[in-house]
Amino acid sequence: MENIKRYFKNLTETQISQFEALDALYRDWNEKINVISRKDIDNLYEHHILHSLAIAKIIEFTPGSKILDVGTGGGFPGIPLAILFPECEFLLVDRTGKKIKVAEDISNQIGLKNVSLRQCGVEEEKGLFDFVVSRAAMPMNELFRISRKNVAKQQQNALPNGIIALKGGDLTAEAA
């Protein structure tokens, strides 16, 4: 949590309390279903929340922006971004019902009013969004192929509308 405060110095008290609440909520859910690797739950803030917030270091979404989180799993990167950008609208989608249930419960418990959730693949989502975000949900070429239809043409942010994917590991095969 301290790293979040260090990198994001202008958090409100509400945002701080929302971020602080995530640890207990994810631990509780992780005891019921495997939301985050059991070996990695102690690194929740650095490996999952702060990683999700890396997007905010390249763009500060304009109030009113609409963001689609594809393959959200337990709510990453959507929930941390929704905390940071309370004046933006977030739709979190995932095929797995139990993961959507986790993300919905957590977003409700911390009082997020700017998050909607839907159990579906992005192929089924017809809405238009300023940005599509994703965190290690699928190969880039597949993400681009199935979600580019969801990127709105009308611009309202400093960066052009598009797809922002957080990836890790060896991306050689995806870059080819």
What role is predicted for each listed range?
Residues D42, G71, E89, V93:
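Short gly/ser-rich anion-binding loops that grip negatively charged ligand groups
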Residues M1-P63, L68, K98-V115:
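Class I SAM-dependent transferase core
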Residues I59, G78-P80, A175:
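Residue-level recognition of conserved structural "scaffold" positions that shape functional pockets
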Residues E87-A176:
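S-adenosylmethionine
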Residues L68-V70, I164:
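Conserved beta-strand elements of the Class I
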Residues G74-E87:
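Conserved SAM-binding loop of SAM-dependent methyltransferases across substrates and taxa
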